[in-house]
Amino acid sequence: MKVFYDADIKLDALKSKTIAVIGYGSQGRAQSLNMKDSGLNVVVGLRKNGASWENAKNDGHEVLTIEEASKKADIIHILIPDELQAEVYESQIKPYLTEGKTLSFSHGFNIHYGFIIPPKGVNVVLVAPKSPGKMVRKTYEEGFGVPGLICIEVDATNTAFETVSAMAKGIGLSRAGVIQTTFREETETDLFGEQAVLCGGVTELIKAGFETLVEAGYSPEMAYFETCHELKLIVDLIYQKGFKNMWHDVSNTAEYGGLTRRSRIVTADSKAAMKEILKEIQDGRFTKEFVLENQAKMAHLKAMRRLEGELQIEEVGSKLRKMCGLEKDE
């Protein structure tokens, strides 16, 4: 595994280039501001007078329509949601994607699964911070950065590495370290992590633990503290020190109980389910399902969101977060 740092990368490859960041959500804002503050020439491409138009202007950006930005830019960095990218690409970006330009992403979904097929003569790269946008910006402003990934799918100009690594440096990623990988590896591992562990697995584990305690007669408030609130403390220890030192920092009771009981929670069946989830990602079944969901205007997803918001743990959690000063009334 090759890791690149600031000293390994020069920004010179981008000094005479214009980078169009398409989208101004969490990542779009953070990445565009960081590159701008690194001295790079950045424009932001958005829907005319859309919700983010004024936000980007107020942040000091030159804001253009997506078509105008794509025409002007040497590098087009697409940071709108996965499900919108192909349609926007075909109608507003592709006509201006001339030979020698670079098409860039922060997630490989649409390239890996073939929803976007760039023309010949165009570099296709990926630069992905391994952190939410707010932390990408916060750590940059503090003089550091978050780790990131770079990938090269097509090197049409023989300068794709210089381009994508300089983008990573401009965003601040090489301050912490940038790993080179592939579109396939980034896409499939990212989807798996979200579904099986980080978003899907963890929330289901928390919910099951909370419900077990409440159903046994314990107060919802105590159940929330013990199964959800304190999770951050443990995750922070793992994040900073790894498993071994996390076990060292908790009590002997917690260490013994956790080590002797954990395999009864995440069982061989759980791992078999993870392998099936990974297969669905690898063979495209998940992608087809998600595309159909998007075509149905996210009806199932919206229903799941509503049900999730009605869970008892959400009501109790909101009350306790306000008590702790972590959440404010909207």
Swiss-Prot record:
Residues bound to Mg(2+) 1: D190, E194
GO terms classed as biological process: isoleucine biosynthetic process; L-valine biosynthetic process
Binding site for NADP(+): Y24, G25, S26, Q27, R47, S52, D82, E83, L84, Q85, G133
Residues at which substrate binds: S251
InterPro entries: 6-PGluconate_DH-like_C_sf (IPR008927), KARI (IPR013023), KARI_C (IPR000506), KARI_N (IPR013116), KARI_prok (IPR014359), NAD(P)-bd_dom_sf (IPR036291)
Cofactor(s) this protein requires: Mg(2+)
Record's keyword terms, sorted: Amino-acid biosynthesis, Branched-chain amino acid biosynthesis, Magnesium, Metal-binding, NADP, Oxidoreductase
Enzyme Commission (EC) number: 1.1.1.86
Domain KARI C-terminal knotted: 182-327
Domain KARI N-terminal Rossmann positions: 1-181
This protein's pathway: Amino-acid biosynthesis; L-isoleucine biosynthesis; L-isoleucine from 2-oxobutanoate: step 2/4; Amino-acid biosynthesis; L-valine biosynthesis; L-valine from pyruvate: step 2/4
Domain of life: Archaea
UniProt key word Magnesium: yes
GO molecular function: ketol-acid reductoisomerase activity; magnesium ion binding; NADP binding
Function: Involved in the biosynthesis of branched-chain amino acids (BCAA). Catalyzes an alkyl-migration followed by a ketol-acid reduction of (S)-2-acetolactate (S2AL) to yield (R)-2,3-dihydroxy-isovalerate. In the isomerase reaction, S2AL is rearranged via a Mg-dependent methyl migration to produce 3-hydroxy-3-methyl-2-ketobutyrate (HMKB). In the reductase reaction, this 2-ketoacid undergoes a metal-dependent reduction by NADPH to yield (R)-2,3-dihydroxy-isovalerate.
PANTHER family: KETOL-ACID REDUCTOISOMERASE, MITOCHONDRIAL
Similarity-based family: Belongs to the ketol-acid reductoisomerase family.
Protein name: Ketol-acid reductoisomerase (NADP(+))
Protein's organism: Methanococcus vannielii (strain ATCC 35089 / DSM 1224 / JCM 13029 / OCM 148 / SB)
Taxonomic classification: Archaea, Methanobacteriati, Methanobacteriota, Methanomada group, Methanococci
